[in-house]
């Protein structure tokens, strides 16, 4: 159970959260550096590698719970979740090739704003704090688009693809919330099939859109090219670093740190990712409009997250 008081939180939990934030924030610059590989294939490689890491945990937990523990309805939700994850990850990786790293991370991180638009459809009330947060976030996004220039690194199409990643990750998160919280599904029983299926959808997309194949001897257009000695260290890092240490670390620290604190911490991924990108390449594209709009985008997302936390407390008090 999370402790509400930071004084009761062990120091190593904060250290683990910091490591998890660094891990997930590093994924963007690593994936961007793999530009010799087409984006959809690159995304499929990442899903394949992560699924392989998750497989032992899935086998152990699935055998422990038995096949009767997962209903047909659960499998349908897992399938839908995998489609959302595939579109999210494919769109985001594509955006890394078509806009700046900072813009890609900013636009893919504003999913709390997207969730507000879906709240009426899922039976949740939209309050004034939600609306204010969305307005602040949208203002920031519009300001950030001021850095779009013909032939420049920041593009509307790249930002739009990153935003599509934000839209679709909401479906993935809602499916995960239902299966993990309401159905009490073990983490690996949920994460492995979703990740594995997402890798398949992305592989099919890479075949149809990028000319990838299973038999090609050129690793950069092979569905399993990540097993080549050149690319294996990259995918191993992405799977073990951002994939396992990042996301598993986040789930672990929730035992000691409140979900709202973890959520807000992770909203700083664009800032940390931008710094990592600057350290990696020695340069960063950061126009004046991004400097003005980026903080507003993050502020809006934080406002929505805080408002949703207040709403959860109110609903718990009523029940």
Could you tell me what each predicted segment is?
Residues 23, 59-102, 108, 143, ...:
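Specific transmembrane alpha-helical segments of multi-pass solute transporters/efflux pumps
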Residues 57-58, 111-135, 271-291:
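C-terminal transmembrane-helix exit sites in multi-pass transporters
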Residues 1-44, 57, 82-83, 87, ...:
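Glycine-/small-residue-enriched transmembrane alpha-helix faces in small-molecule transporters
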Residues 36-87, 112-118, 167-175, 191-212, ...:
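Transmembrane alpha-helices of multi-pass small-molecule transport proteins
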Residues 45, 104-110, 175-199, 239-279:
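Helix-helix packing/entry segments at the starts of transmembrane helices
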Residues 21-52, 100-103, 171-198, 217-218, ...:
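Juxtamembrane helix-loop-helix junctions in multi-pass membrane proteins
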Residues 54, 58, 126-148, 166-169, ...:
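Hydrophobic transmembrane alpha-helices of multi-pass small-molecule transport proteins
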Residues 2-3, 47, 231, 263, ...:
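C-terminal-most transmembrane helix of multi-pass membrane proteins
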């Amino acid at each position: 159970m999370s402790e509400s008081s930071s004084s009761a939180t062990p120091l190593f939990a904060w250290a683990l959260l910091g490591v998890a934030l660094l891990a997930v924030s590093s994924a963007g610059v690593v994936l961007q550096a793999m530009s010799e590989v087409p984006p959809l294939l690159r995304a499929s490689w990442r899903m394949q590698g992560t699924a392989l890491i998750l497989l032992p945990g899935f086998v152990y937990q699935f055998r422990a719970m038995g096949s009767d523990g997962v209903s047909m309805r659960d499998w349908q939700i897992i399938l839908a979740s995998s489609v959302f994850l595939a579109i999210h990850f494919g769109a985001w990786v594509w955006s890394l090739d078509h806009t700046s790293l900072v813009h890609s991370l900013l636009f893919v991180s504003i999913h709390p704003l997207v969730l507000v638009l879906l709240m009426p459809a899922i039976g949740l009330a939209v309050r004034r704090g939600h609306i204010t947060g969305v307005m602040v976030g949208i203002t920031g996004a519009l300001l950030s688009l001021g850095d779009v220039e013909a032939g420049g690194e920041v593009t509307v199409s790249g930002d739009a693809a990153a935003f599509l990643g934000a839209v679709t990750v909401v479906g993935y998160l809602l499916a995960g919330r239902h299966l993990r919280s309401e159905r009490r599904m073990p983490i690996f029983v949920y994460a492995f099939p979703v990740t594995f299926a997402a890798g398949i959808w992305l592989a099919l997309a890479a075949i149809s859109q990028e000319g990838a194949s299973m038999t090609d001897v050129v690793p950069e257009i092979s569905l399993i090219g990540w097993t080549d000695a050149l690319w294996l260290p990259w995918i191993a890092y992405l799977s073990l670093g951002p994939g396992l240490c990042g996301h598993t670390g986040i789930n672990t620290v929730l035992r000691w740190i409140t979900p709202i604190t973890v959520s807000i911490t992770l909203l700083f991924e664009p800032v940390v990712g931008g710094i990592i990108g600057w350290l990696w390449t020695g340069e960063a594209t950061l126009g004046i409009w991004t400097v003005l709009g980026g903080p507003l985008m993050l502020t809006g997302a934080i406002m929505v997250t805080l408002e949703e936390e207040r709403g959860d407390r109110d609903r718990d008090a009523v029940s």
